[in-house]
């Protein structure tokens, strides 16, 4: 939470601005400075991740249009250039396609991909446990 905040809704950063990626193996090192925290180890299939290669990435419209400043401040892409990077867009939102998929498939059994982690774990595991207790404690 923000310094001095008493309630669970007072976090400095909103949870919807924390993304995770699928298809790559990576670590987030909380000891490194901003802009240097993420290290991509490989593609999820074990093939090398190459910084000199251009990859196609699926994003929701919020992110693709600059929401959360991940692409603008995080990647240094000017806001006015974002629309030129979109190569495909749907006419419906992600919820529509997710609901449609669930209706067709029926019961789903989601599983964690375990393709990323925070390090050093001696700091991050206790912090995650503490945060979970704080966020999901019983309302009295």
Per-region residue spans from a language model:
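Catalytic centers of hydrolytic enzymes
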Residues: 1-140
């Amino acid at each position: 939470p923000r310094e001095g905040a008493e309630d669970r809704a007072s976090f400095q950063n909103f949870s919807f601005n924390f993304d995770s990626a699928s298809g790559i193996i990576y670590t987030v090192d909380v000891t490194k400075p901003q802009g240097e925290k993420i290290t991509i180890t490989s593609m999820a299939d074990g093939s090398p991740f190459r910084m000199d290669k251009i990859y196609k990435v699926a994003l929701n419209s919020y992110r693709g249009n600059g929401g959360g400043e991940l692409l603008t401040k995080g990647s240094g892409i000017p806001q006015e250039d974002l629309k030129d990077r979109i190569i495909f867009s749907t006419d419906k939102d992600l919820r529509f396609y997710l609901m449609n998929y669930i209706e067709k498939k029926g019961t789903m059994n989601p599983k964690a991909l375990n393709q990323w982690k925070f390090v050093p774990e001696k700091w991050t595991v206790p912090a995650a446990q503490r945060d979970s207790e704080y966020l999901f404690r019983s309302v009295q």
